[in-house]
Curated annotation (Swiss-Prot):
Keyword Translocase: yes
Domain of life: Eukaryota
The protein's name: Cytochrome c oxidase subunit 3
SUPFAM superfamilies (alphabetical): Cytochrome c oxidase subunit III-like (SSF81452)
Gene: COIII
C-alpha cells in the first residue's frame, strides 16, 4: 500500500525497545545493589546483556529507517544533530561533577588526609610514563578521525576507510594501556578519596572510550558496505563529535588529575 506524506517529520512505528531497554537498566541498577551486598553477579549480568542487545537491535532499526527506507529527511537529521549535541552537553556536566569532587578534596585537603595532597601513603602514577603515551595515542586518534571525515566529504572512500581503521586501532591501544595502568597501579579505589576520584573519573572515561571505539567500528563497517556518502553520513559525524569530546575530557583528566594532582 502506497501512502503520501505531507510533512518532513518521521512518525516512528510502535517499538518494544524503549520498554525492554528500561527493564535492562532496572536490572543493572538492582543487580549493582545485589552485587555490592551479596557478591551475586547474575542480575547485573542479565541487565547488561539485555541493555546491550536492546541497543544493537534499536540502532539497527534506526539504520534501516535512515539508509533503506529514506525516512530521515533534512528536518529529521537536524533534530538528530541537536539530540547528539544535547547528549554531549549532558556528558560534559557528568564529568564536571567528577572534577568538582576532585578539586573539592585536593585544593583544601582535610586533616584526615594529613592536610596534604596526594594523601599520605598514596604513591601517584608518573604522569610522564603511560599517561603521556595514552595522551599521544588519543590525540593521534582525533587527528585520524578528522582525516577520515574530510576524506569522506571529498569522496575519497579508501582514505576514509584507512583513517577510520587507524582510529579504531588507536582506541583499542588506549584501552589496553589503560587496563595495564590499572593493573599496575600502587593504589586502589578504596585508598582514600584520591583513589576513589581517580578511578571513578578515569574509569568512566575509559568506558566512554570503549563506547566511542564501538561507535566508530560500526561506522567503519557501514562505510565498507557503502552506507555512507559524501552528503549523507550523519552517523559518522555524530561518532566523530563524540570522539572529539572523549579527547577533550582526557586532556582535562591528564592535566588536572595525572599532572597537577600528583
Amino acid at each position: 500500500m502506497k501512502s503520501t506524506v505531507y510533512h518532513p517529520y518521521h512518525l516512528v512505528d510502535p517499538s518494544p525497545w524503549p520498554y525492554v531497554g528500561a527493564c535492562g537498566a532496572l536490572f543493572i541498577t538492582v543487580g549493582s545493589v545485589v552485587y555490592f551486598h551479596y557478591s551475586q553477579t547474575w542480575v547485573l549480568l542479565m541487565g547488561a546483556i539485555t541493555l546491550s542487545l536492546t541497543m544493537i537491535v534499536w540502532w539497527r532499526d534506526v539504520i534501516r529507517e535512515a539508509t533503506f527506507q529514506g525516512l530521515h529527511t533534512m528536518v529529521v537529521k537536524q533534530g538528530l544533530k541537536y539530540g547528539m549535541l544535547l547528549f554531549i552537553l549532558s556528558e560534559v556536566l557528568f564529568f564536571f561533577s567528577f572534577f568538582w569532587a576532585f578539586f573539592h578534596s585536593s585544593i583544601a585537603p582535610n586533616i584526615e588526609l594529613g592536610a596534604v595532597w596526594p594523601p599520605q601513603g598514596i604513591n601517584p602514577l608518573n604522569p610522564f610514563s603511560v599517561p603521556l603515551l595514552n595522551t599521544a595515542v588519543l590525540l593521534s586518534s582525533g587527528a585520524t578521525v578528522t582525516w577520515a571525515h574530510h576524506a569522506l566529504i571529498s569522496g575519497k572512500k579508501t582514505e576514509a576507510i584507512n583513517g577510520l581503521t587507524i582510529t579504531v586501532v588507536l582506541g583499542l591501544i588506549f584501552t589496553g594501556l589503560q587496563a595495564m595502568e590499572y593493573y599496575e597501579a600502587p593504589f586502589a579505589i578504596s585508598d582514600s578519596v584520591y583513589g576513589s576520584t581517580f578511578f571513578v573519573a578515569t574509569g568512566f572515561h575509559g568506558m566512554h572510550v570503549i563506547i566511542g571505539t564501538t561507535f566508530l567500528a560500526v561506522c567503519l563497517a557501514r562505510l565498507v558496505y557503502h552506507q555512507f556518502t559524501r552528503h549523507h553520513h550523519l552517523g559518522f559525524e555524530a561518532a566523530s563529535w563524540y570522539w572529539h569530546f572523549v579527547d577533550v575530557v582526557w586532556l582535562f583528566l591528564y592535566i588536572c588529575i595525572y599532572w597537577w594532582g600528583s
